[in-house]
Amino acid sequence: MTKGILGRKIGMTQVFGENGELIPVTVVEASQNVVLQKKTEEVDGYNAIQVGFEDKKAYKKDAKSNKYANKPAEGHAKKAGAAPKRFIREFRNVNVDEYEVGQEVTVDTFEAGDIIDVTGTSKGKGFQGAIKRHGQARGPMAHGSHFHRAPGSVGMASDASRVFKGQKMPGRMGGNTVTVQNLEVVQVDTENNVILVKGNVPGPKKGFVEIQTSIKKGNK
């Protein structure tokens, strides 16, 4: 069955394995996870738990900052006996009988050796050209060339008379939802509420990430 938890990427470091191998790891802090709602096949058509992460400030009238919860979010969290949460995600295909509304989900949900998928938001790179954004080849860098980093042809002239949808062109790069699959949990530190994940995960330091059992290898 699927397991999941929400957290923040702290940064990267390295640890030694039992065989002396040096392993690069990403440190993910995963505290304040609370089950806000249980969904079942009988009522909702599928099994899932809804998990909230990171407290928001209580509702405040006329508050314009998103640090404050709105009334519906505050009421939803109140049913679970929890503070309103900034991030809320669902994890499907879980054993809902193992969870109760209001229960805290801790890092010991996972253990060393588990294979997981990590979802985050990639670093924003701003407006970039086709070479950096899409990996296109550049033109000749010789003195006589007129095209060094230009994107080249974007379509036909008289026949199509338009640029087709999906044409790779310069534009804003990064800031996308990215999932890295089949990463390994190297270590779980229950004292500090952190999980050490082998390799790197999407996003900058302090970026929000979602960890769940690998969809390809986790249930074998």
From Swiss-Prot:
Pfam families: Ribosomal_L3 (PF00297). Coiled coil: none annotated. SUPFAM superfamilies: Translation proteins. InterPro entries: Ribosomal_uL3, Ribosomal_uL3_bac/org-type, Ribosomal_uL3_CS, Transl_B-barrel_sf. GO terms for biological process: translation. Keywords: Ribonucleoprotein, Ribosomal protein, RNA-binding, rRNA-binding. One of its GO terms (cellular component) is cytosolic large ribosomal subunit. It comes from the Bacteria. One of its GO terms (molecular function) is rRNA binding. Belongs to the universal ribosomal protein uL3 family. One of the primary rRNA binding proteins, it binds directly near the 3'-end of the 23S rRNA, where it nucleates assembly of the 50S subunit. NCBIfam families: L3_bact. PANTHER family: 50S RIBOSOMAL PROTEIN L3, LARGE RIBOSOMAL SUBUNIT PROTEIN UL3C. Part of the 50S ribosomal subunit. Forms a cluster with proteins L14 and L19. This is Large ribosomal subunit protein uL3. It comes from Staphylococcus haemolyticus (strain JCSC1435).
